[in-house]
Each structure stands twice: as C-alpha cells, then as structure tokens.
Amino acid sequence: MNVKRKATLKFGICIGLLCVSFTGFNSLFGSTHAEAKSIENTKMTSCITNQKFVQLEKKFDARLGVYAIDTGSNKTIAYRPNERFAYASTYKVLAAAAVLKQKPIEKLNDVIRYTKEDLVTYSPITEKHLDTGMSLKEISEAAIRYSDNTAGNILLQQLGGPKGFEKSLKQIGDHVTKADRFETDLNSAIPGDIRDTSTAKALATDLKAFTLGNTLTTDKRTILTDWMRGNATGDELIRAGAPAGWEVGDKSGAGSYGTRNDIAIVWPPDRAPIVLAILTKRFTKDAEYDNALIAEAAKVALDDLK
C-alpha cells in the first residue's frame, strides 16, 4: 500500500468513526434497508449537530459542554459531555432536591434563622428577612427562582456542607460532581481546579433523577419542578432557544472565566420531557459571558430532538 493510499484510508476511517456511519455493519445485525437508512440518518444528524457546536465555540470564543436526554426516545445529544466545568449556581436546584429527599414535606415549613454575618453577595431575598427568618420552602424557592446566594449556602448547610451535598449526589449515582466550597467562593472557576465542578452529563443525569425518576415522591417532584418553572433568571438562556410552545423549567449559573450555565427540563407539547444541561466557559478570569451562546446551543440541541 502506498503512503498516499494509506493516508486516505486513515482519513476515511476517522470520518467514519466521527460520524458513526459504517452502514456495512447493518448486515451483521440483520437490519432491513429501511432500518439501516433510519439509523444512518440519525447518526449523520448527530455529526451535523456536533459541527454546529464546534462553530458556536468559534463564534463565541468559548468552551461548551452539552448533554440532552429525550426521555421519550432515549436519544441523547452530547458535546464534550464529560468535560469538567464549574457548576456555579446550577447546584442550587440539586441541593434543594437533595433537601426535599431528606426531609418530610411538613419540614419545609420550619423557619430557618440567620444573621447579617451570614449574608453574602447577591442575596436579594434573604437580605429582606433578617428579622423574621424564612421557611425552608421559601429558602429553596429563593435559591432556585432568584439564585439567592445566602439561600444556597443555607441549603448546603442543611445537607451537612458542600461534602454533604456531594454525598447526596453520590447516593443517586453521581460520582463525578465535586463540591468543596460555599458561596461565593465556589464560583472562582479557575482552569484546572476541579473543586466545585461537574460535567454536562452528570448534571443532566442528576436533574433527570430528581425531577423525572423515582428519587423523589410525586408530590416532591411537583414542588421542585414548579420552582424551576418559575425561575426568574433564565429567560435569555435555554428558554430563549426552545421552540414556541415548549415549556422550560431551569436553573442558571455564572462565575469567573466567563462561566455561564443552564440546566433544564423542557416539556414539548404532547411529548415526554427533555433534560438539557449546557455549560460554558471562556479563557480569561475577567471574561464576560454571553447568554446568546446558551440560547443558540439550546436551539441546536432541541432542533435535533424535534
């Protein structure tokens, strides 16, 4: 075999592996022509979708992690699904879910008191209730709907601190997410630092377990998803990239190095829901994030799942 032919062959194999389009394997598994054509079209769509994510990274000069699960068809969309990103405030919905798992619903009415010294930057709800305290339900709602950082810290404290939160995720099968610090230190997002990081796949899988699986009882799942549907910080994110008429419940996050994240449940009309996690980061500490990157990545993923 000459060198030119060998190089061409290697290139062809690489392309075949990248787009997973070896139709020659169909006969080995007894696929009909129609089935083979359907499988090939699905795989080629995934390859095209992958390239769209590459282009978004170039357009926004950012790094992107995406994982989507269509719970009706079990089809997944994945782009850098196992790469670590700072999770930022997305943890708040998972921490609230873990608290729901641990406590009877009536305990959500327990009043939690805190002091001025407990307040951290960006606590728009908890700072208004220093004199009276807030119920655990109100604190959870403040953390999810308004991304209140003091509320987030209180949820972590309810779980035994960041490591208690990490343990609660391990109990549902997540051995990837690393939780180490409270607000607001957890948003530092220093490249190479695995503290307070996760992956798009891990976060999407956790969210699916809490909102659509049997980890929580039906009444607790309803409480959690109602909080997510009322999120006031996500209108420019996954919600902006979803088709008209598709309902979105989400939890956003932001941090240093242009970190901007959103994890969501998406309810298309008359179909099973879709779980979607989009994590992004840039390359300098003071880089600004761009909400449009999340919205456009969501559109790419959800269009592929239409």
Swiss-Prot record:
Residues reported in the UniProt entry to bind substrate: K251, S252, G253
Q: What top-tier enzyme class does this entry carry? A: hydrolase
- GO molecular function of the protein, one example? beta-lactamase activity
Q: Which residues form the active site?
A: S89
Which Pfam families does the entry link to? Beta-lactamase2
Q: List the disulfide bonds.
A: none
Q: What does this protein do?
A: This protein is a beta-lactamase with a substrate specificity for penicillins.
Q: What is the official name of this protein in its record?
A: Beta-lactamase
Q: Gene for this protein?
A: penP
